[in-house]
A protein has these predicted regions:
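Substrate-binding N-lobe of the ribokinase-like
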Residues: 2-62, 70-73, 195
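Active-site metal-binding loops of divalent metal-dependent hydrolases
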Residues: 8-10, 136, 188
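Electropositive phosphate-/nucleotide-binding environments in soluble metabolic enzymes
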Residues: 12, 22-25, 29, 92-95, ...
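Short active-site-adjacent structural elements
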Residues: 14-15, 162-164, 190, 218
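Conserved beta-strand termini and adjacent loop/short-helix elements that scaffold enzyme active sites
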Residues: 45-49, 156-158, 173-174
Length: 222
């Protein structure tokens, strides 16, 4: 059995930080990198269903980034489904096919959403235990999302997060880190939460751990 399985988007990211250029593997790559950096012993199954590329501009002066992308140059609508403890789906709202989600053989399932298209078929959320979404991309009725997802909708931002559980709402605050490269911060957050939840099964504590881990990782990378 795998500890974590990653589905959804894998991207070739071309990055411009002012006039400095670099390239990296993004989306699934960001989540995989974070999981392995905080817990190298994790058994991770990589099953990208859509592969594409993105051009990303970073402005460290105001800790922002923007991008244009073609996320679905290549598609595989029949990924291998292996038994795993926790499955995570990257960029759910940009997937051109979500049919594989109902076949996932996993104790827990989560997904995140990104800037771009709105998720049209919200019924797919009924398959999820957790949904991660940035406050920038929050175009939805939170109460509708909370009703659909099995456990929690976690809305995160640079200053913290709001965790909408079935029975309560938990607000977490953190110090904003100024003048940094925030690329991949949302992916780091999801990965850190997943690793903590696998160890503790505690939602609210895992949110706190995720914030602390992301702050540490961003400080180390900048």
């Amino acid at each position: 059995m795998f500890d974590v399985a990653l589905y959804g988007h894998l991207t070739h990211d071309r990055i411009l930080n002012k006039f400095k250029q670099s390239a990296t593997v993004g989306s699934i790559g960001n989540v995989w990198k974070t999981l392995k950096s905080i817990n190298p012993k994790l058994r991770i199954d990589l099953q990208p269903t859509e592969i594409g590329e993105a051009l990303i501009y970073i402005n460290e002066d105001i800790s922002e980034r923007t991008s244009v992308a073609n996320l679905s140059l290549y598609t595989n609508y029949s990924p291998n489904i292996n038994k795993t403890k926790f499955s995570h789906i990257i960029y759910l709202n940009e997937l051109t096919n979500t049919s594989f989600i109902t076949d996932l053989n996993s104790t827990y399932i989560s997904a995140d959403m990104c800037a771009g298209k709105q998720l049209k078929d919200l019924s797919v959320l009924k398959n999820l235990d957790f949904l991660f979404i940035s406050d920038e991309d929050m175009y939805y009725d939170i109460e509708e999302l909370r009703l659909l997802v099995k456990k929690s909708v976690i809305v995160h931002c640079p200053s913290g997060s709001i965790c909408y559980n079935k029975e309560d709402t938990i607000i977490s605050t953190v110090d904003i880190i100024e003048n940094i490269n925030v690329l991949g911060a949302g992916d780091m957050f999801a990965a850190s939460f997943i690793n903590s939840f696998l160890n503790t099964s505690d939602i609210n504590n895992s949110v706190t751990v995720a914030h602390n881990t992301v702050s540490k990782l961003l400080n180390n990378e900048n």
